[in-house]
Every structure is written in C-alpha cells, then in structure tokens.
A protein has these predicted regions:
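Sequence context of c-type cytochrome heme-c attachment sites
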Residues: 1-83, 95-158, 164-178
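Elongated alpha-helical scaffolds
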Residues: 83-89
Length: 178
C-alpha cells in the first residue's frame, strides 16, 4: 500500500513542520482512538453490520480504499491505514464531491505522482528547476530523494465543504455525529 498511498512518514522528509503538526492532531489518531473503536464496534453491532464501512471511510480512508474489513484489528491493518487521515487523504483528491459520506476518490500512486493543494505548482516548479541543488529525483529507481512530479491547484481543499465530506456526519438513525 505504500506504493498506492504513501505514508505520512515518507512525506516528513520534505515537510517536517506539516508532519509534526499532523502527528499530534486528531487526524493522525482517527483510526487508533479507543473511543472511536468502541463506538464503531457498537454501531456495527447494533446495525447487525449493515452500517458497513461508514465509520472506516472517514477514520481510515486508506483502509476503506484498500477494502479492509471495518472489524479488522488495527494490528492487522496496513501501516498507512493505521495513520488515519494521512497526508495523501487530502492531497490526492482533485475533484469536488460535495456529499457527506466520506467516500473519497483518492488517487493511488507512489510519492512521485502529482499532489493537489490550494497553492498550486509555483514552489514545486522552483524545486524541480533546481533538482541538483535540492538532490531530488522524479523517476523510480533514480538515486536521490523522491519528489512529486507536480503539485496541481485545487482550491476546494481549503473549503469547509471539502472537510464536510467527513466532518458533517449523521448516522443511519439520524444521530448527528458532528
């Protein structure tokens, strides 16, 4: 799964400040939280499993996209799945969804694939135009620090409706989660 959905630890190499902020955030613990795990298991029990991957889709989008069973132990999950809402969960989405289901259309791919964000490509171009200075590479197997081939503009990433895909959840019985 690292080649499909790179780990946040991989992103840390170039983005230590952002990684450190994420590492102490609720996003990094979303799949590991004992409160979440208890509630998710209870909901699955009360719904006789018909709730499916509803909780997993937001708490571990990578796990949901990998098809992991919602009842699977975290010990058996892929390490990137255990990271919860990791860097690629937000930066590998390139279209508006505007639905509150957590069904995120994550683009799969290695670290070399493009990422998306509100700032676009200016900084990435500066680094790519100075590959030797920054010792970065954009080809599999090249010696050096791998970097995305581009960063594409996606202003929706900084909108509340983007976050609302998960942060505006309601259970099947109408109970509002947030």
């Amino acid at each position: 799964a690292e080649t499909q959905y790179p780990s946040a630890a991989t992103c840390r190499t170039c983005h230590p400040k952002q990684y450190n902020e994420w590492a102490v955030s609720q996003h990094s613990y979303s799949q590991l939280s004992p409160a979440y795990l208890s509630l998710s298991n209870k909901i699955l029990q009360l719904s006789n499993g018909t709730n499916g991957d509803f909780c997993l889709r937001c708490h571990s989008p990578v796990g949901a996209n990998l098809g992991e069973n919602p009842r699977m132990s975290n010990l058996k999950r892929h390490p990137t799945s255990r990271e919860g809402i990791t860097c690629m969960v937000c930066h590998r989405i390139n279209k508006r969804y505007n639905k509150v289901s957590g069904r995120l259309d994550l683009e799969e791919g290695s670290l070399l694939k493009p990422v998306y964000g509100p700032l676009g490509n200016a900084e990435m171009e500066r680094v790519l135009n100075n590959k030797d200075k920054y010792r970065v590479v954009t080809e599999e197997g090249e010696a050096g620090r791998q970097i995305h081939i581009s960063s594409k503009g996606f202003n929706h990433l900084s909108s509340s409706s983007f976050c609302g895909s998960c942060h505006d959840g309601t259970l099947f019985n109408g109970f509002r989660l947030e």
